[in-house]
Amino acid sequence: MARVTVEDCLPLVDNRFALVLLGAKRARQLMAGARPILEQSKNKPPVLSLREVATGRVKFDRDVREALSGKYTGDEPK
């Protein structure tokens, strides 16, 4: 994979907005010192995070997806 595009990731993520949130969250984790899932490369964290999404190794948690859609049913403090 020479370049990672949105189209490479969209089959694995519901929509472009969710992809942006997922990629940004993973990039922040990598910058904070999280271990990369893929082999070490000279890619910057945002590119590496999209590569991880494109391979299907990074996915949205169901609770996050429901919270973003406004349908979260978890135990929320009242």
UniProtKB/Swiss-Prot annotation:
GO terms for cellular component: DNA-directed RNA polymerase complex. It catalyses: RNA(n) + a ribonucleoside 5'-triphosphate = RNA(n+1) + diphosphate. Its EC number is 2.7.7.6. SUPFAM superfamilies: RPB6/omega subunit-like. Coiled coil: none annotated. InterPro entries: DNA-dir_RNA_pol_omega (IPR003716), Pol_omega/Rpo6/RPB6 (IPR006110), RPB6/omega-like_sf (IPR036161). Keywords: DNA-directed RNA polymerase, Nucleotidyltransferase, Transcription, Transferase. GO terms for molecular function: DNA binding; DNA-directed RNA polymerase activity. GO terms for biological process: DNA-templated transcription. The RNAP catalytic core consists of 2 alpha, 1 beta, 1 beta' and 1 omega subunit. When a sigma factor is associated with the core the holoenzyme is formed, which can initiate transcription. Belongs to the RNA polymerase subunit omega family. Promotes RNA polymerase assembly. Latches the N- and C-terminal regions of the beta' subunit thereby facilitating its interaction with the beta and alpha subunits. NCBIfam families: rpoZ. This is DNA-directed RNA polymerase subunit omega. It comes from Myxococcus xanthus (strain DK1622).
